[in-house]
């Protein structure tokens, strides 16, 4: 087999790769950073990286090979120092950092990395990110000297994200755990910058303290992190306003007025866009199987109103391609920008003209009648019960569509029932968050358009709930995943974008954001819009694992 080696050169000097503005300056050490998150439940002191509902601060304890910033695609070395694709992109070779110790003083080696992934293979119930799923095409993981080699039986370069962000566990601890899905790991041993100091269940607080064996000299700056969970966004806001928190993760309505404007020099927030909210069509049902009808619906919806009423204009309206803002420069086909701009506009007359072009007209009651003389029925817009933002958007969409003769009602279903309706295809339209997040648009398109994830109505779809498939899109997805050549990958994404804008299998509505609010009364160095070196939240989820860089960079004023 012809051997092609593609290197991603990553400088191992931490002060260069992390890009921390504070490095080399006169930094003030110490202090306890008070972090409050609204998670809707009380603290469950489970420190297992295999917990389906992981604790947010897990990345401060268990490091991954790399930090992959899904906002902008930036990759930062952690336990891995560099990587390269070999053998026609069938092998991923990761160089493992030397001189690292686990928090109990045991040396960390490449064997720990190989063990982490093979442990998932031995225990499929904890393989939450599908490392060994058939669709990953992963064949083996082996440690060789200071490297770990991931071998694939079919090229799948986007899967780097899953491998790079998997928390690495110590073999000398976990090899003795026979039922990992049932173990809550009360005394976690990691390589990260912090260790667990205290757990106070009545106060819903975990206190972390510096790991004395951490490999990065001079980091972290803060001595401790007190992580508290609360039931509601309101409680989190109250703690922030009362100076009982330094960093909060919560949705705060009208954040600019309620928080930032009170003291602009100190009260800060950054809600970076990481995904989108979409209006799903059931494209196997009439009239949503007609792309012109879908285009008319798109023009009939005032997306700016959705953003204003549901999200107070913080996240912005979504790009019609579904690409998030920080990825547009790299992945948006510039020749499609005018079309995307047009499709993002609100134009009720354009919607009416499109409907007329395919034989629809309004009757005396203002309802659309098809060319067959039948009045369109009242359609349902499916939303989860209690999801106030989705409900608000559904109400506006319903009014917008009524203006062009499409009558709808809002169908609120409980979370599990809502998901069942999406997966089985028993809906007309639905508001949902876009499936698939990652450092490029590929992850959205792969989740939404992969035929393997679709199904006929009544059968279970994994993630292609619109049930839209297109052989040209499928081919482009295959081109992207089979190469590490950026130019080829960009062309593949351009192809999908064009089809997306022509067919509109779903409508991107508004951007989804992370929620990070903080006070700079005591601490500074948080990521922000001008320095997006990390997320504005700690994230411990499979596929969305990060925030360690924020924990390393924040310091006393």
Annotate the PLM regions.
Residues 200, 210, 298-337, 389-398, ...:
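Detector for C-terminal structural segments
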Residues 182, 213-258, 398, 407-409, ...:
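Ligand-site clamp/hinge motif
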Residues 84, 95, 130-176, 521:
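Surface-exposed binding/hinge segments that line
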Residues 35, 201-203, 358-437, 486, ...:
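Ligand/substrate-recognition segments at binding pockets and active sites
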Residues 36-87, 118, 189-191:
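N-terminal lobe/hinge region of extracytoplasmic solute-binding protein
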